């Protein structure tokens, strides 16, 4: 059982970023509960790249915390490629500060949240959002972090 991490650092600054070992642990803690083998690219970017990707793929002209790009293999081709996560350093840092959350807890949450999208979970409909948020809470707790939605419910 393993998750292969391909880490790409495309941010001008690497100060305050999680270590490769932390990212690996968060991916393992999320994905191995669903499948035995996977390969995930995590690309940490600045706001300009996040904004460009968010506009191109979601039609939203602003940077966002995490974008998930699931890999869709052609029929009959079995590969462990799960997909790519693109995480914007500045947005994660800003959100953590605004929400009063520890920075590493918010990084972990973005990896968990994005990984669940790669696994096919979504939050467009209310029932889907509830299921996904429950999984996020459970996984974050297993990883040793507080409920990431606690402040949202106050």
Curated annotation (Swiss-Prot):
GO terms of biological process kind: rRNA processing
One CC-aspect GO term: cytoplasm
Cofactor: Zn(2+)
Residues noted as binding Zn(2+) in the record, renumbered to the chain: 113, 117, 123
Annotated signal sequence range: none
Annotated compartments: Cytoplasm
Record note on cofactor: Binds 1 zinc ion.
UniProt key word NADP: no
InterPro entries in alphabetical order: MetalPrtase_cat_dom_sf_prd, YbeY, YbeY_CS
Enzyme Commission number(s) of this protein: 3.1.-.-
MF annotations from Gene Ontology: metalloendopeptidase activity; RNA endonuclease activity; zinc ion binding
Keywords, sorted A to Z: Cytoplasm, Endonuclease, Hydrolase, Metal-binding, Nuclease, Ribosome biogenesis, rRNA processing, Zinc
Pfam family, one: YbeY
PANTHER family linked to this entry: ENDORIBONUCLEASE YBEY, CHLOROPLASTIC
Assigned protein family: Belongs to the endoribonuclease YbeY family.
Entry function: Single strand-specific metallo-endoribonuclease involved in late-stage 70S ribosome quality control and in maturation of the 3' terminus of the 16S rRNA.
Protein's name according to its UniProt entry: Endoribonuclease YbeY
Organism: Aeromonas hydrophila subsp. hydrophila (strain ATCC 7966 / DSM 30187 / BCRC 13018 / CCUG 14551 / JCM 1027 / KCTC 2358 / NCIMB 9240 / NCTC 8049)
